[in-house]
A protein has these predicted regions:
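N-terminal leader/targeting and accessory segments in enzymes
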Residues: 1-89, 93
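Phosphate-binding loop of NTP-binding sites
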Residues: 8, 86-162
């Protein structure tokens, strides 16, 4: 739990009045919202998160963040320039900057990413370094969070890094 103004530090204009709550979690999935969550309304290829803001509030959201002009006049809906960037900053703030506490290695390319990351993990494990591999083969070693995608979304990724 963290105070809402600390989660949204550097994201919002200081003149915005926020509810006085402790944030329990962050998500862009209205079905995952629980009491005290902040809901981020991502617009996707097939769905628009703005259509689910009402559901998020019914499930307990304390605030919704959007980059849509249509909804900013609603109570506890805040407009930002880019909701995806705001989500990344909020995740970093909420989880106390876990990306600064670990070494991250990204592997890109058409072929060989899983093989390369598996070999690299083996080398690092052999030198007694703590490792975490995230990719098409899942998350190694296993963690309690089960992302629904090959690459975890920003919310799952920060929870995993935490």
């Amino acid at each position: 739990m963290i105070e809402i103004d600390k989660v949204l530090n550097t994201i919002l204009n200081e003149s915005i009045e926020l509810p006085k709550v402790l944030v329990q979690g962050l998500t862009n999935n209205s079905l995952k919202v629980k009491k005290g969550y902040i809901f981020f309304a991502f617009k996707g290829e097939n769905n628009d998160g703005n259509d689910f803001i009402e559901d998020a509030f019914k499930n307990g959201a304390c605030l919704a963040i959007t980059d849509s002009d249509k909804l900013e006049s609603q109570k506890n809906v805040v407009k930002v320039k880019d909701v995806r960037i705001a989500a990344g900053i909020a995740c970093s703030n909420f989880y106390n900057y876990p990306q600064n506490k670990v070494k991250l290695i990204g592997i890109t390319g058409t072929n060989g990413k899983t093989s390369t990351s598996t070999i690299l993990k083996s080398i690092l494990d052999a030198t007694n370094q703590k490792t975490l591999q995230i990719g098409t083969s899942g998350i190694q070693p296993s963690v309690e969070i089960k992302p629904g995608l090959t690459t975890p979304d920003i919310f799952d990724l920060y929870e995993i890094l935490n």
